[in-house]
Amino acid sequence: VYRQDEMYGTGVGASLCRRNEAFDLPIRKRRDGGWKIPAGTVVFTCFTSYLLRKDAEGWRPECWEWTRRRRDCWFYFFTKRIDRLAECLPPDWGEGYENVIIGCTVENQDRADARLPLFLELPIRHRTVIAAPLLTALDLREYLDPEKIEELTASGESGREARPCHYEWVLSLREQC
C-alpha cells in the first residue's frame, strides 16, 4: 500500500494517522435522503489505514457507531495486529456485530501460529484468514475450523520489489480447506 502511495505522490506513510475525505462516506446521504452507499454494499474499511491503532482512538467510536447504524451494509476490515482487537471493541459488541467481517492476516507459519489461536478465541461472528503477502508454504489445518473461519484468501505481493508467491503454496491452502 505504501509503495503505491509513494508512486502516486500522496506522501502518506505508515506513521501518519489521518481521516481522509471519504471518512464518513458510510453515513452520507444523497439530496433525496437516501444513503450514498446503498444497502447490501460491502464497505472495505481501513484498507490503507489501521482501525486498531492507538492514535485512532479519537475517531474509532464513530466507526463503530456507523457500523451499528448501517446494519444494512457489511463492514469488512482486516488486521495483522489481532492482539489489539479486544481493547478496541465497543461496549455493546457482545459476540460481534452481525454485519462485521474481520480478517486476520498471516504471511508465514510463525505469524499464523502467533495470531490465529487468539483470532479463533475472540468474539467475532464472521472471520476470514488472509494469507498475504504469502511468503512461504503454510500449514493452517489446525486453525481452519469451518464453524469459525468462513473464508481463506491468499495472495502475493505486487510491484517491482515483490517477493515470490509460489502456486504450490496457494494450491496447498486450497487442499487444506
Residue ranges of model-derived segments:
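Glycine-rich loops and low-complexity Gly/Arg-rich segments
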Residues: R68-D72, C104, R127-I130
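Radical SAM enzyme [4Fe-4S]-AdoMet core and its adjacent flexible, acidic
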Residues: D5-A14, E21, L25, E98-V100, ...
